[in-house]
Amino acid sequence: MYVTMMMTDQIPLELPPLLNGEVAMMPHLVNGDAAQQVILVQVNPGETFTIRAEDGTLQCIQGPAEVPMMSPNGSIPPIHVPPGYISQVIEDSTGVRRVVVTPQSPECYPPSYPSAMSPTHHLPPYLTHHPHFIHNSHTAYYPPVTGPGDMPPQFFPQHHLPHTIYGEQEIIPFYGMSTYITREDQYSKPPHKKLKDRQIDRQNRLNSPPSSIYKSSCTTVYNGYGKGHSGGSGGGGSGSGPGIKKTERRARSSPKSNDSDLQEYELEVKRVQDILSGIEKPQVSNIQARAVVLSWAPPVGLSCGPHSGLSFPYSYEVALSDKGRDGKYKIIYSGEELECNLKDLRPATDYHVRVYAMYNSVKGSCSEPVSFTTHSCAPECPFPPKLAHRSKSSLTLQWKAPIDNGSKITNYLLEWDEGKRNSGFRQCFFGSQKHCKLTKLCPAMGYTFRLAARNDIGTSGYSQEVVCYTLGNIPQMPSAPRLVRAGITWVTLQWSKPEGCSPEEVITYTLEIQEDENDNLFHPKYTGEDLTCTVKNLKRSTQYKFRLTASNTEGKSCPSEVLVCTTSPDRPGPPTRPLVKGPVTSHGFSVKWDPPKDNGGSEILKYLLEITDGNSEANQWEVAYSGSATEYTFTHLKPGTLYKLRACCISTGGHSQCSESLPVRTLSIAPGQCRPPRVLGRPKHKEVHLEWDVPASESGCEVSEYSVEMTEPEDVASEVYHGPELECTVGNLLPGTVYRFRVRALNDGGYGPYSDVSEITTAAGPPGQCKAPCISCTPDGCVLVGWESPDSSGADISEYRLEWGEDEESLELIYHGTDTRFEIRDLLPAAQYCCRLQAFNQAGAGPYSELVLCQTPASAPDPVSTLCVLEEEPLDAYPDSPSACLVLNWEEPCNNGSEILAYTIDLGDTSITVGNTTMHVMKDLLPETTYRIRIQAINEIGAGPFSQFIKAKTRPLPPLPPRLECAAAGPQSLKLKWGDSNSKTHAAEDIVYTLQLEDRNKRFISIYRGPSHTYKVQRLTEFTCYSFRIQAASEAGEGPFSETYTFSTTKSVPPTIKAPRVTQLEGNSCEILWETVPSMKGDPVNYILQVLVGRESEYKQVYKGEEATFQISGLQTNTDYRFRVCACRRCLDTSQELSGAFSPSAAFVLQRSEVMLTGDMGSLDDPKMKSMMPTDEQFAAIIVLGFATLSILFAFILQYFLMK
């Protein structure tokens, strides 16, 4: 049965809650008998359930929780209901009773059960915003259905709750909630979770009224901690507690009061936080070396009321620092106690500690830090001593000082075991030094030491034990190990201690083994201090060699003598199953068997062959053979009897198991003699068909097979048939030959006697296959073919046919007749031929002979068919001058079976022999000369015929380089010329010139290649020398380069200056200004100013100097003046002056009233100045425009006439 406590409003219970939300189990709940019924009260989130214990006290339980209660008689136990509320018991149709606690209000008494069970029905506004309620959900929430007595889901209507204002609140179900966040869980949240909760809390406080003003038990979120309020934490009935101030409960909440409620809530939280920050510094007591006791008092002003039942409803955090007052603190304790024991501290260390107080998720500031110093104590455990030096009778040890823990180390205690292991330790040194020397010790002895440190407070623990050895002698060679016992896969060895070693000396023994006879190396098998060893995983019946070495701290002895021992063999495996060897007769048979696959590692001494017959009872086996042979023949057995055989073997390893048995049955009596075979039909030339009858048999055993024997004319007998049939066909016979046949029968008893002989003659047939014909070559290039007569097959040969061809597919008949030889002529040299032969008689044609291959002898090469001169061969392919050489090329002719060795080139009066090549350069020829050339090939046989004559002419000599001259020199260019451009000879030869310039690296680079006789080199540097050379090339080739010519560029003239600017001054004067030109390569620049007055035709120079301005006085009014200026470069090295072009002219008119100046061509505003003469640039533009117009006009006229 389940009792669900449902609350439709927050209940301001004034009862003390349980500490940490734990549900106190009443004694009668735990110790009740089995007949009582358990009633489970489900406390929803944000609700409080109060019960009365047996002692009369009231206990408050916060939701979510499930409270089990015992009912002795099945009735609802008494539930404490606060004032203004009633408990209503509702029973559904299934008999399940539930308790609903509702306020005494008409609207809270629902007429129907579903309304009372609605999660948000008649809830005040502050409950709808509580984080333990789920908002904006479209899912209906029902109590957990765990039995047939639960309420049907239709009593829980689905509600669409208002939109939540909590962004990241955890969703908790309304019913069935049995776990919740306790105070300890909230305090143990990680920092990043706390920060996230703070952000959520700020949003909640800004968007919802605080639930604490209604004295609810909802969970508030502040400072990163969430905690459920207990009934008494919000202010008890007496109001004496220092908790959050109690306000009167309201039945409904109005949105207009939200701002005032939030301000009041924040003031309360601020007041609590200020009280928590006033906690006093903790008290330190019971200071020890590694522990201390801290205690503190709760902050003043927040003690609980008399109804709370709690003395200290706070939690505290203790922070510790060993880096000073302002160092980094670490939280070492978090809980609700007022005292904590700090352990694992460092002795003689200064510490600072401070405490924080927290109440209801509000954390105050830390207290004033208090300092303390742990006491000093005994030193730390030192490290083991180290061996500094040793001899045969002394050991020198040294060590480092451990941590003194606040008190200076006064002495060290060194103990040893005096070389007696496991006999206890005794003091061997006590003092303040950090080293100790022990003398009068035994050689090669191990001593165990341990160390402790002592100060004024006490003695430390002992260090780890360390073993040190004195020097000693290398052990003597030990005696060879002794074999104690040998097994199949193991041997046990034993040895003695080497002579001269004391009983206390520690000796390490290494047992080495040689496993492979081919490998002379010994491998270690055991290393230790024992005097015996069992070597395992060995091979059976195998010889091994062992030797022993002894070693101590001083070194290793020589190996002992070698012990040779052998492992024991294993018993052999069973032999193979016996097999019948030869035929089984009626009175005996032979059997054989193979040796066992596994002989156990030793030789097989003898085999036992056992036999039993099928009539024996209980399979009584008898030994029929005992010996070393692997086969045996049984005789005098009963015909037609079943026998079983098995074998076993014996070796030094033991007696093997028996093999599988072999059943063998003896044969019956052989059949009688058959009648002679007879011919069925007429004999053929290659086969006969025979048949015979079943022989008579007295034993009545069926014949299983027949055997037919044939005797050839050479008295060679062979079996031609073996099978159960009464007839057979014998083939591959010779035509016209007499054969003798006889037959015998076979059954289980063996073969019967042969029948009488039948003589049969085969019919005549075609001739047999001819032998391969013999081929021989004659000196005159003919081929002589001869052959022998084949077997006639009972009839004379009437004709031979010889076929000849280059391959098998091209064979043709070249001879037919009765002769046995034939001569073939007109064959190609070094050619491949083949032939075959066939014989004929009256019975038909015989088979062809084997194909015979033949190759005719080689001869002299054929004439060269293609001979030519390479005209387009590159000139640089051969170093010789093309005017004195010819490049010949030809195709290789047919060599007629012999590789070509050389070629002979005939030039008429001379001949040249070259190797096996298809190209040759004829050198040392006359320029511009015609030659008649022919060629022939030569091989080992001889020289072939000459090819046809060809005519070839050599090229003329290449031209000589012309003389190079400088036609014009400029500051950035040089115009070069060479040769005579009007010469007809040069034009006819079509000469190409290559002009090269020498760069800074003294290398010549080509700058021009072509037929022209002039070239202008541009982009040069002024007043610089350049070196050139030239080469002429024609169809005859490239000629030599000329000598080097050097030419120099001139200096640059100054650039043209823009038109000057004229400015009228006072009186009859003006000032002329022009732009300056920078110095050129260090040479200064002067300026020349000229003026043209009125209608004069020539300019007059009025100024020359380095200034860029000049003033002229004494001018006449209403007179046209034109000024122009040019720059003049004065060369310092040559005292030469280079003048540039004059600038455009600038017009100027001196007027009395208004002077109009211009620096441009015709840019004055005065009408009289506009009618002045145009400048030089305007004249040039007019001329260019006129020529362009005339050109376009003439082009239209020409196009018109051409189109017409």
From Swiss-Prot:
Biased composition of type Gly residues is found at 228-242
* Coiled-coil segments on the chain, per record: none
Protein origin, superkingdom: Eukaryota
Annotated Gene3D superfamilies: Immunoglobulins
Pfam families in the cross-refs: fn3
Tissues and organs where the protein is expressed, per its UniProt entry: Predominantly expressed in white adipose tissue (WAT) especially in the stromal vascular cells. Expressed in adipocyte differentiable 3T3-L1 cells but not in the non-adipogenic cell line NIH-3T3. Expression increased in the early stage of adipogenesis.
Q: What is its main location?
A: membrane
Q: What is this protein called?
A: Fibronectin type III domain-containing protein 3B
* Originating organism: Homo sapiens
